[in-house]
């Protein structure tokens, strides 16, 4: 099949949500609809308790982190879907943000009772950096929650994105009877389903169908009135606005009951964009170019000390990957033979034979690959848009054995290049300050320092609230350094960073130094 045809079939996306909105359940059920049924079945057997296919990022010491489930590829109708998992709860990390730089669209999952929550707002800000198209699924309609129209207002108000309802719920909680599809003019009646069957639910064609009155009684007339109101009061779906990231199509349902997801997946396959290409520092690389290009957005280490292998995740931007091909690792200027790339089809960690734009392949990495690295078939390219994000949590590294200082510095430098943490060295002392966006990142770093560098290290609280990279002309920066050097550090790449003791302090500094920029992201 031609490169163009294969590329057009690809849909690469991630799910953004607040913990407990149902992301894991939605992921599982999408796999079910994608025919990866063995995965939904394997969910219960993997551990004695009910653990889910995509929840892999617990520190699974005994057998290492299962890399396979961080990317799940499955076919649905005539498209091939690549779902990138975004760790949610306490294992939230900068990886979650960076994963969003490697997708072409995102699915926002919202709990009907809770509406828009903090984490969703943060993840949405990251999607905004690239105007990523967003689809929305409002989940848990089998429970009581906010009125649908109120939820749409909240999404529009808080996230500044127009909502276009595609499906509409008929009641909720105990009165939940199904959903109406505004564009297909069909009603799907609700039936709860067990975990392993895709729920069909009876389909009634036409809002004026008398069968609706038989099934729903007085609710049918209420539904007709409500739909008339909804059509008048809400936005009509515009594909162009969706692709620009200014409008989100909204679907309602109950993931735990496999209900409403088929409409969502159909909409996703129909409207979500295929891979188009990506901006590099010198030019725009189109997905249909013949030569392979790709970039690294994540590196995942194996937590098993016996297996030091790390896997670098590469998003293919253009061309076709074929097993055994040689690629240029642009940053180090070397050609490397990619003999054993990993592919992620239906949760089998297999060797990739071929892969196309939009696909993710795993490269075995022995410490030479960094986040943001570009691979090509010879051209000196550097893809942009894979940033470091300003950390939100900070700790100072304290050594138990001062003789291990060199090993600690080496370990922290390498781990920061890999994206496990960020390292800041204050100008005025020898402190090593670590930054992260999720608390588990510190535990992972401590464990890896011990296993891989034989360094025992404690992390203690430090008086830093937030960090910003400082950009400006040299004369202004020199003046700045002379005045505030006690709060200035260098990151692992040698870039200047202001480490603010409080948010208020940061605001004051920004006001006092209007010629300088204090930015929350920095390109790798």
UniProtKB/Swiss-Prot annotation:
A molecular function GO annotation: GTPase activity
Keywords, sorted A to Z: Cytoplasm, GTP-binding, Nucleotide-binding, Protein biosynthesis
List, alphabetically, the GO terms of the cellular component aspect: cytosol
Per the record, the major location class is cytoplasm
Could you tell me the superkingdom of the organism this chain comes from?
Bacteria
Q: Which GO terms describe its biological process?
A: regulation of translational termination
Q: Where does the record place it?
A: Cytoplasm
**Signal peptide, first to last residue:** none
Gene3D superfamilies named in the record: P-loop containing nucleotide triphosphate hydrolases (3.40.50.300), Peptide chain release factor 3, domain III (3.30.70.3280)
Q: Which PANTHER family match?
A: PEPTIDE CHAIN RELEASE FACTOR RF3 (PTHR43556:SF2)
Q: What does this protein do?
A: Increases the formation of ribosomal termination complexes and stimulates activities of RF-1 and RF-2. It binds guanine nucleotides and has strong preference for UGA stop codons. It may interact directly with the ribosome. The stimulation of RF-1 and RF-2 is significantly reduced by GTP and GDP, but not by GMP.
Q: Which NCBIfam families match?
A: prfC, PRK00741.1, small_GTP
The name on file for this protein is: Peptide chain release factor 3
UniProt gene name: prfC
């Amino acid at each position: 099949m031609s490169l163009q045809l294969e590329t057009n079939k690809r849909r690469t996306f991630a799910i953004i949500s607040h913990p407990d909105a149902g992301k894991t359940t939605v992921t599982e059920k999408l796999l079910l609809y994608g025919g990866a049924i063995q995965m939904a079945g394997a969910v219960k057997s993997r551990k004695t308790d009910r653990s889910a296919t995509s929840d892999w990022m617990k520190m699974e010491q005994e057998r290492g982190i299962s890399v396979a489930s961080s990317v799940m590829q499955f076919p649905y109708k005539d498209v091939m879907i690549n779902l990138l998992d975004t760790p949610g709860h306490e294992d939230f990390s900068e990886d979650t943000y960076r994963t969003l730089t490697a997708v072409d669209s995102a699915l926002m999952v919202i709990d009907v009772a809770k509406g828009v929550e903090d984490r969703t707002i943060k993840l949405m800000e990251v999607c905004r950096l690239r105007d990523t198209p967003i689809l929305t699924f409002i989940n848990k309609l089998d429970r009581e929650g906010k009125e649908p129209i109120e939820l749409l207002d909240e999404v529009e108000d808080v996230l500044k994105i127009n909502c276009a309802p595609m499906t509409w719920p008929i009641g909720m909680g105990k009165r939940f009877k199904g959903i109406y599809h505004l564009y297909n003019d069909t009603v799907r009646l609700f039936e709860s389903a067990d975990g392993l069957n895709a729920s069909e639910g009876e389909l009634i064609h036409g809002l004026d169908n008398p069968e609706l009155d038989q099934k729903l009684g007085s609710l049918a007339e209420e539904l007709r009135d409500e739909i008339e109101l909804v059509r008048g009061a809400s936005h009509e779906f515009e594909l162009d606005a969706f692709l620009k990231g200014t409008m989100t199509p909204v679907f309602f349902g109950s993931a735990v009951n496999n209900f409403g997801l088929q409409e969502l997946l159909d909409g996703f396959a129909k409207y979500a964009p295929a891979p188009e290409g990506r901006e590099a520092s010198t030019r725009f690389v189109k997905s249909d170019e013949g030569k392979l290009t790709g970039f690294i957005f994540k590196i995942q280490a194996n937590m098993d000390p016996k297996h030091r292998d790390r896997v670098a995740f590469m998003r293919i931007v253009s061309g076709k990957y074929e097993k055994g091909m040689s690629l240029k690792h642009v940053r180090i200027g070397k050609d490397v033979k990619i003999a054993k790339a990993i592919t992620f089809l239906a949760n089998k960690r297999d060797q990739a034979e071929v892969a196309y734009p939009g696909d993710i392949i795993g490269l075995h990495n022995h410490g030479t690959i960094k986040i943001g690295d570009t691979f090509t078939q010879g051209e000196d390219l550097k893809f942009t848009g894979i940033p470091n994000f300003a950390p939100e949590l900070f700790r100072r590294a304290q050594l138990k054995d001062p003789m291990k200082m060199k090993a600690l510095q080496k370990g922290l430098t390498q781990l920061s290049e890999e994206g496990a943490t960020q390292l800041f060295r204050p100008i005025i002392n020898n402190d090593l300050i670590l930054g992260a966006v999720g608390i588990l990142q510190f535990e992972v770093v401590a464990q890896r320092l011990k296993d891989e560098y034989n360094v025992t290290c404690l992390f203690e609280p430090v008086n830093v609230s937030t960090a910003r990279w400082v950009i400006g002309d040299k004369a202004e920066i020199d003046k700045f350094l002379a005045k505030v050097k006690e709060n200035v550090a260098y990151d692992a790449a040698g870039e200047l960073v202001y480490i603010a003791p409080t948010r208020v302090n940061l605001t004051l500094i920004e006001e006092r130094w209007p010629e300088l920029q204090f930015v929350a992201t920095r390109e790798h």
